[in-house]
Every structure is written in structure tokens, then in C-alpha cells.
Amino acid sequence: MVDPQLCCTPLSAAPLDRARAKQLAGLLKAVADPTRLQLLSRVAAAGDGEACVCDLTAPLGLTQPTVSHHLKVLVDAGLLTRQRRGPWAYYSLVRERFEDIRSLLSL
């Protein structure tokens, strides 16, 4: 048997349990799409911290139903919040969720 101290780097953080791994996998699945990454980027870059779906369709060259579908995936993953105002929905980042991604990437 090989001595782990001679060949292996010790873990600097506790390994993920199954529940946390599933949670983070869902989060990564939500952002593992170029359109959704663009949407997150546009919402993050919005001057007042939120973006209307009506302002996100033309820059991406996508229809409103397609953009709304991708935004729903991001809302369901907890990365965005949605607020209805009349016929439009406005989206804002949930910055705390990005800490989850950041902590995962620093493993």
C-alpha cells in the first residue's frame, strides 16, 4: 500500500456531501449554456441592477419566448429573481448564489 502522505495532497476543504453535490450540479447545469451566460452577463451589466425581458431579446437575436425560457431556468436555479410589472418581467441577480459557484471553483 502506498503511503498517502508521500503521494497525495491533503484536502484543504471538506469533500462535498451528496446533497451539496446535487445542488451545485444543478447550479452548474443552469449556467452551462452560452445563452444563459449571456443573459446573466447582461443582467449583471444593467445600470440599475435589473433588466427587463423586453430589453434582452434584441441583443441576443432571440424571440421573447426563448429568452423567457432561459430566464426561467436561471430563476429556478436561484441565480435570478423575477418581478412582474404590468406585462413585463424584470430580472435581478442573486449575488449570494454566485458565491456558491466561486467556492466550488476554488476546491
Regions found by a protein language model. Give the residues of each.
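N-terminal leader segment of winged-helix/HTH proteins
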Residues: 1-31, 77, 105
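N-terminal helix-turn-helix DNA-binding core of bacterial DNA-binding proteins
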Residues: 22, 26-63, 85, 89-97
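Histidine-centered divalent metal-coordination motifs
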Residues: 36, 69-70
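Residue-level signal for well-ordered alpha-helical positions
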Residues: 43, 104-105
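Alpha-helical residues within the helix-turn-helix
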Residues: 58, 69, 75-76
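Residues that scaffold the ATP/ADP-binding catalytic core of kinase and kinase-like folds
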Residues: 100-101
